[in-house]
């Protein structure tokens, strides 16, 4: 077992540090050019569509979702424990400058996720009973109609079911169990039972219940976390300018805070920012297109602009709030990490220490635990939907109940078990599913360019 663990860890290291960073950043640059900077040109349009659709009690649809429900479901999956623990890890290893590189990655990722949403809309399938299905498996088969496409789509479907539907849920429920046990002394297995029961109620309700839950939970959890972060920043407002200064300073000269030569330090800052940013906003990963395919919109371009807002919310709002709070309290003002890592502070407790510096230990730990609970549970709900669509693709609707039952078992087991191999396998399948998704995106990039150009031409005619 130890040998297998080492093999999987080695595969993950090469995938995350080299293959995926080059692939995903390259795709972001490529689609930025092909769409003529759609993330800049249509940024305002995306927000207008977001606020135009915003609702905590959205209209019920016989099939699919509203545009806002689709975005809420996507954001539910995007905004997870990585927005807290992942951001802390990037800062601890790569220094405050890692956040700058997260912003750069997210900017280009907005073009990639636009492409994913457009293709998901273009290739979605409406079944005779009105059920809407869509996602990478459908545009992979459009890109490669023969045997190769069938193989790639099948590979993607299996990878995402394992990575998100089953093992990924274990990782998220484990975070919930640990957070609540540390903050409230509730046994992790008890939280596992509670989370599993609530998840079962949602899963059995199908797509409509998932949409109804995510459109309510996402605005609440985001506002709660941002409010707590704002309180900390206001309390430490004299250090906010220094915080932004550290982000930009250590983006290009991180060696003084993380050690090593300038080349090694700069590589570490960039790789940590890129890796954590990519895995947080999921642009190019092939997960969120499942939600965007279900949106009932007039044109694929419309949902593409809304999808970009998901990346912005995840990285430029929620993840950035974590970064500002942590840097403002633990780095700025000659904080405990101002001169590098110290014993007793790790990525798993940085957020608690940061919020506790203003809220006090008890309230700070409780606040982070509650936010982690919201973030992790919403991710479980979103990921379950993505896995369900791929189960339908492979086995048909008859397998939905069995899939939900297995997912619920994994959620409970994850709350009270900690297995490094499971965590590493989750990362491996999560990264492997990027490969077929990216191949199909590039192969169908002409469709994306046409959608962006058509909107641009129509906009010019209206002037």
Give the location of each predicted region.
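Flexible loop linkers connecting adjacent transmembrane helices
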Residues: 37-65, 89, 95-96, 111-147, ...
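Selective recognition of specific alpha-helical transmembrane segments in multi-pass small-molecule
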Residues: 108-116, 193-207, 218-238, 271, ...
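Transmembrane helix-loop junctions in multi-pass membrane proteins
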Residues: 2-4, 34-39, 82-87, 165-177, ...
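Helix-loop-helix module between adjacent transmembrane segments
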Residues: 31-32, 105-130, 137, 141-174, ...
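Alpha-helical membrane segments and immediately flanking helix-loop junctions
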Residues: 58-92, 119-122, 128-137, 141-143, ...
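N-terminal alpha-helical transmembrane segments of multi-pass membrane transport
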Residues: 1-81, 91-98, 109, 412, ...
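Membrane-interface loop-to-helix entry segments
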Residues: 23-30, 34, 38-47, 156, ...
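Extracellular/periplasmic helix-exit of transmembrane alpha-helices
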Residues: 115-128, 230-246, 254, 258-261, ...
């Amino acid at each position: 077992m130890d040998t297998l663990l080492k093999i999987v860890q080695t595969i993950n290291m090469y995938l995350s540090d080299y293959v995926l960073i080059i692939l995903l950043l390259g795709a972001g640059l490529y689609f930025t050019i092909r769409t003529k900077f759609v993330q800049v040109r249509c940024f305002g349009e995306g927000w207008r569509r977001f606020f135009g659709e915003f609702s905590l009690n959205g209209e019920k649809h016989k099939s699919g979702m509203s545009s806002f429900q689709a975005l809420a479901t996507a954001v539910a999956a995007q905004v997870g424990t990585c927005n807290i623990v992942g951001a802390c890890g990037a800062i601890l290893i790569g220094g405050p400058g890692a956040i700058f590189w997260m912003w750069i990655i997210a900017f280009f990722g907005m073009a990639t996720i636009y492409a994913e949403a457009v293709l998901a809309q273009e290739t979605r399938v409406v079944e005779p009973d009105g059920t809407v299905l869509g996602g990478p498996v459908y545009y992979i088969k459009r890109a490669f109609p023969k045997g190769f496409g069938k193989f790639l789509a099948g590979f993607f479907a299996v990878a995402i079911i394992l990575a998100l539907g089953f093992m990924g849920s274990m990782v998220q429920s484990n975070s919930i169990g640990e957070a609540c046990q540390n903050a409230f002394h509730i046994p992790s297995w008890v939280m596992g039972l509670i989370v599993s029961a609530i998840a079962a109620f949602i899963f059995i309700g199908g797509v409509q219940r998932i949409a109804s839950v995510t459109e309510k939970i996402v605005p609440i959890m985001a506002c709660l976390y941002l409010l707590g972060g704002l309180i900390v920043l206001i309390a430490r407002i004299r250090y906010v300018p220094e915080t932004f200064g550290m982000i930009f300073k250590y983006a290009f000269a991180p060696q003084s805070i993380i050690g090593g030569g300038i080349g090694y330090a700069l590589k570490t800052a960039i790789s940590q920012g890129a890796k954590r940013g990519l895995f947080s906003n999921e642009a190019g990963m092939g997960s969120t297109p499942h939600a965007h395919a279900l949106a009932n919109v007039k044109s694929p371009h419309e949902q593409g602009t809304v999808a970009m807002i998901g990346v912005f919310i995840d990285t430029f709002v929620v993840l950035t709030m974590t970064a500002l709070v942590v840097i403002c309290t633990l780095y700025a003002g000659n904080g405990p990490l101002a001169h590098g890592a110290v014993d007793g502070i790790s990525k798993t407790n940085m957020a608690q220490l940061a919020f506790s510096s203003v809220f006090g230990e008890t309230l700070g730990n409780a606040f982070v635990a509650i936010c982690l609970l919201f973030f992790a549970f919403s991710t479980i709900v979103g990921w379950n939907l993505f896995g369900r669509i791929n189960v339908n693709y492979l086995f048909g609707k008859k397998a939905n109940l069995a899939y939900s039952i297995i997912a619920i078992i994994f959620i409970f087991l994850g709350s009270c078990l900690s297995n490094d191999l499971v965590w590493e396998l989750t990362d491996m399948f999560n990264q492997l599913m990027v490969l077929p998704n990216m191949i199909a995106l590039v192969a169908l990039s002409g469709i994306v360019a046409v959608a962006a150009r058509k909107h641009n031409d129509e906009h010019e005619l209206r002037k």
